[in-house]
Structure formats: structure tokens, C-alpha cells
UniProtKB/Swiss-Prot annotation:
The keyword Oxidoreductase does not apply. Residues 104-124 have a biased composition (Basic and acidic residues). Residues 125-137 have a biased composition (Acidic residues). Belongs to the bacterial ribosomal protein bS6 family. It holds the Pfam family Ribosomal_S6. GO terms for molecular function: small ribosomal subunit rRNA binding; structural constituent of ribosome. InterPro entries: Ribosomal_bS6, Ribosomal_bS6_sf, Ribosomal_S6_plastid/chlpt, Transl_elong_EF1B/ribsomal_bS6. This is Small ribosomal subunit protein bS6. Residues 96-137 are annotated as: Disordered.
Length: 137
């Protein structure tokens, strides 16, 4: 079996259907005896150039190990699904399992935001406790 990196873009109005699409497409690959090494849903992002007068699309990245026949079936499924704007399948030399730079950046942003949210909350609770102590005196 060969290793592939697959990226597909979904119409932004169909973002609610993306989990079902991912399930369907991973099912095609795993039924052929393939294995999913990495699956990342990047969400709705800005396009580099308009596609069918759209400026945003929902991005999904998969790194898989499967047969060439399964990849052909997947590409056919992409072609017949009108919600899939673009797709790209690249053969890779080895399985890629670590998080992509996009996912790493998102994780860093999320941790930064959560730590920033916790800090004001902690300050607010300290101020509330101090004001409660002052009113009690």
C-alpha cells in the first residue's frame, strides 16, 4: 500500500455536512484495507483566489495509507460531489502522523486564548473577594 496526502475544499454553505463527508470518504479508504494516519478539519478559511465567485471554503486534510484503487474511487466520489470545490491527492514517501503547521498554529492560538481568558477571570474573582471583604468590614 502507498501513502497519500489528500486535501479537499468544501463549499462554505455545506460546512454542516463536512463531518458526514469525512466519515464517508474515510469509509471508502478503510473498506479497501487502508489506514488513516492523520485527519485534520481546518475549518472555513480564506481562498487565495476566488473559485466560482467564492472567497472562502472549508478545508480538510487527510494522510492515509491505502491502495491506488481506493484513491481512484475517492477521486471519483470527489468529482461527483458538487459540494467539493477542489481536491488534491499527492503520493508521499512515508506516513505523516505529526500535526501539520496549520494545526500547530491553531493549537497555539487556542492555548493562548484560553490562558488569556483565565487570567482576567482570576483577577475578577480576586477583586470580587476583596470587595466582599471590604463591605463585610
Amino acid at each position: 500500500m502507498r501513502h497519500y496526502e489528500i486535501v479537499f475544499l468544501v463549499h462554505p454553505d455545506q460546512s454542516e455536512q463536512v463531518p458526514g463527508m469525512i466519515e464517508r470518504y474515510t469509509g471508502i479508504l478503510t473498506q479497501a484495507g487502508g489506514q488513516i494516519h492523520r485527519l485534520e478539519d481546518w475549518g472555513r478559511r480564506q481562498l487565495a483566489y476566488p473559485i466560482i465567485e467564492l472567497h472562502k471554503a472549508h478545508y480538510v486534510l487527510m494522510n492515509v495509507e491505502t491502495t491506488a484503487e481506493a484513491v481512484e474511487e475517492l477521486e471519483t466520489a470527489f468529482r461527483f460531489n458538487d459540494a467539493v470545490l477542489r481536491s488534491m491527492v499527492m503520493r508521499t514517501k512515508a506516513a505523516i502522523t505529526e500535526a501539520s503547521p496549520m494545526a500547530k498554529a491553531k493549537d497555539e492560538r487556542d492555548t493562548r486564548r484560553s490562558s488569556e481568558e483565565r487570567a482576567p477571570r482570576a483577577e475578577a474573582t480576586e477583586e470580587a473577594e476583596e470587595s466582599a471583604e471590604n463591605t463585610a468590614e
